[in-house]
């Protein structure tokens, strides 16, 4: 499956956090793995971008090229690392969820606007809700 973390999304947020899968893939399976096969960086990026977009019917995303919609993470690959998981209580009625932060993400851009910079929200909210497949 190209979309590892879409199964059961949110159903068990108090006991696991699969949002860490992309960071784990890049930091361990691409960069740090000592035994067994390492993934090529290009392969991992393709799995997390183009393959995932196609899997969910988003033909207008997944690559950085003219005419395509693209959000982008700028990553300091050498500093990329997961932080220790923690339980936080920020859901309605004080509900708990597992949270796992990461270091090494320099910036995240959505629709050309920086929404995260060095792990901090900028307050920008340029994204939009999309429904169903999107043609290129």
State each model region's role.
Residues 2, 7, 74-120, 124-126:
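C-terminal cap of metal-dependent C-N hydrolases
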């Amino acid at each position: 499956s190209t979309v590892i973390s879409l199964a059961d999304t949110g159903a068990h947020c108090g006991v696991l956090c699969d949002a860490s899968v992309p960071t784990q893939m890049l930091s361990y399976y691409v960069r740090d793995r000592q035994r067994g096969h390492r993934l090529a960086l290009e392969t991992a990026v393709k799995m997390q971008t183009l393959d995932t977009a196609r899997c969910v019917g988003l033909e207008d995303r997944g690559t950085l090229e003219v005419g395509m919609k693209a959000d982008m993470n700028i990553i300091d690959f050498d500093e990329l690392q997961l932080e220790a998981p923690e339980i936080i209580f920020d859901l309605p009625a004080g509900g708990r969820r597992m949270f796992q932060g990461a270091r090494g993400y320099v910036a995240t851009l959505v629709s050309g606007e920086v929404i995260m910079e060095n792990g901090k929200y900028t307050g920008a909210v340029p994204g939009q809700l999309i429904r169903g497949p999107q043609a290129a």
